[in-house]
Amino acid sequence: MIKKIGILTSGGDSPGMNAIIRSVVCTALNHNIEVKGIYNGFLGLYNNDMKLLKYSHVANLLNQGGTILGSSRFLEFKLEKTRKIAIKNIYKRKIDCLIIIGGDGSYKAANFLTNMGVPCIGIPGTIDNDVSGTDYTVGYFTALETVVDAIDKLRDTSASHHRISIIEIMGRYCGDLTLSAAIAGGCEFIVIPEIIYQKELLLLEIQKSIKKGNKHSIVAITEHICDVNKLAKYIQKKTFKETRATILGHIQRGGKPVAYDRILASRMGIYAIQLLLKGYKGQCIGVINNKIVHHNINYALKNMKKIFKKDLLNSIKKIY
């Protein structure tokens, strides 16, 4: 019988993490399960930095961005000796299970802990939408709205100055956020990790667009592919058109979660407690075809990688 659980947020924060925390805490307390909030991710687990969470701590979290528990990237957690110290703290606090909110890196840590005897449930919280075993992650749709709003504003000024704009979008090594934002924002050119980047080919496409009479355009590109400022200089030199690069950066992680993320966070938090009550462990939660599902974390990490939406990219190219 589960009497006490711990909850933490790990890695890059995303809008809706607080909504997950609220859902987990309220559902757990309704089943007479105590909840320990673990601060600053796995670093807090290592440092034994925990606090009992009550209704009053989470009552107003549904619409708040960020995470009240704090987050961090604690690379030392990859070391077994570090995890053993964290596990000692878990046993000292008499925690029966951990709920871990984050991305694939957080899932890997959850899998390690499960294999070392600490039952874990993973909930996907990241704007990158790159987590195994789910169509969407909590925070993705809020970030999408943020990026599309930025693209719309760039479109206004690019049109005024007959300028080429390059906008760098987060996503790590997944192009989902860039692709969806580019389609919704009407970007003429899309550069994502799933397609081999060829600078000369991109230039050729831009030159064709100029010959068609297009006086301005926007290039949407996922981070880590190239230096966008250098790319802007290259395009300007070759096309003789003013070209500017904009790096959106961490603004994409902030803001109040949109309705879909709030709903998804609430559903996943409830489902996590239901899984624990049924005796499940070593699971990750996802949403597939709008149905909340769960998978073995180890299986999901190895066999359920995100599928690239190539058909979506190919279809949108027909517009331009």
UniProtKB/Swiss-Prot annotation:
Assigned keywords, A-Z: Allosteric enzyme, ATP-binding, Cytoplasm, Glycolysis, Kinase, Magnesium, Metal-binding, Nucleotide-binding, Transferase
InterPro entries membership: ATP_PFK, ATP_PFK_prok-type, PFKA_ATP_prok, Phosphofructokinase_CS, Phosphofructokinase_dom, PKF_sf
Molecular function GO terms recorded: 6-phosphofructokinase activity; AMP binding; ATP binding; fructose-6-phosphate binding; identical protein binding; metal ion binding; monosaccharide binding
Chief place where the protein resides: cytoplasm
Ligand binding (ADP): 155, 186-188, 212
GO biological process: canonical glycolysis; fructose 1,6-bisphosphate metabolic process; fructose 6-phosphate metabolic process
NCBIfam families, A to Z: PFKA_ATP (TIGR02482), PRK03202.1 (NF002872)
Subunit-level organization: Homotetramer.
Name under which the protein is recorded: ATP-dependent 6-phosphofructokinase
